UniProtKB/Swiss-Prot annotation:
The family this protein is said to belong to: Belongs to the P-Pant transferase superfamily. AcpS family.
Entry keyword set: Cytoplasm, Fatty acid biosynthesis, Fatty acid metabolism, Lipid biosynthesis, Lipid metabolism, Magnesium, Metal-binding, Transferase
Keyword Ion transport on entry: no
NCBIfam families in alphabetical order: acpS, pantethn_trn, PRK14661.1
Gene that encodes it: acpS
GO molecular function, one term: magnesium ion binding
Top class in the EC scheme: transferase
Protein name, as recorded: Holo-[acyl-carrier-protein] synthase
Organism for this UniProt entry: Thermotoga maritima (strain ATCC 43589 / DSM 3109 / JCM 10099 / NBRC 100826 / MSB8)
Catalytic activity from the UniProt record: apo-[ACP] + CoA = holo-[ACP] + adenosine 3',5'-bisphosphate + H(+)
Compartments, as annotated in UniProt: Cytoplasm
GO cellular component: cytosol
Length: 169
């Protein structure tokens, strides 16, 4: 089920490099320092974050640009959250940045695809356990990632994967 869709467009030249300090998280800053085209990187990350908050339907209300980061996997941006934003376990992300930065973020709630390790009897009491995989137990839950992670850790269990969302510290 699609939870939200956000899009943002901005002119790359209008985004100053000093903007990096305000909008980039620590991992994004490390990526930024390796880039030759830094202005495009900042504009792209700003557009992605604006699109993300639009997809949430909240705007920045009560949130900070550094609460989310867009890291990279195989050259593509991947969402990393640093706090709970509600329930979605997939983020589909697209970014283009040449003269304009254009970002699209689609947040989706898929059944299952949340993998945990731990005591089977505890997991079956608390969640709908779908199946056992090589990675661990696949469960169904409506708990957002940090709430789930805290509950699991307090019970000696561990969150292995939360869809395609990276969970920051």
């Amino acid at each position: 089920m699609i939870v939200g869709v956000g899009i943002d467009v901005l002119e790359v030249e209008r985004v100053p490099e000093k903007f990096a300090e305000r909008i980039l998280g620590e991992s994004e800053k490390r990526l930024f320092l390796t880039r030759k085209r830094r202005r495009e990187f900042i504009a792209g990350r700003f557009a992605l974050k604006e699109a993300f908050f639009k997809a949430l339907g909240t705007g920045l209300n009560g949130h900070s640009f550094t609460d989310v980061e867009f890291l990279e996997s195989n050259g593509k941006p991947v969402l990393c959250v640093h706090k709970d934003f509600g329930f979605f376990n997939y983020a589909h992300v697209s970014l283009s940045h040449d003269r304009f930065a254009v970002a699209l973020v689609v947040l989706e709630k898929r059944k299952g695809d949340i993998i945990v390790e731990g005591d089977e009897s505890f997991l079956r009491k608390r969640f709908e356990v779908l199946e056992r995989s090589v990675e661990g137990w696949e469960i169904e839950t409506s708990l957002p990632p940090f709430t789930l992670k805290k509950l699991l850790e307090s019970s000696g269990c561990r969150l292995v994967r939360y869809g395609n969302i990276l969970i920051g510290e």
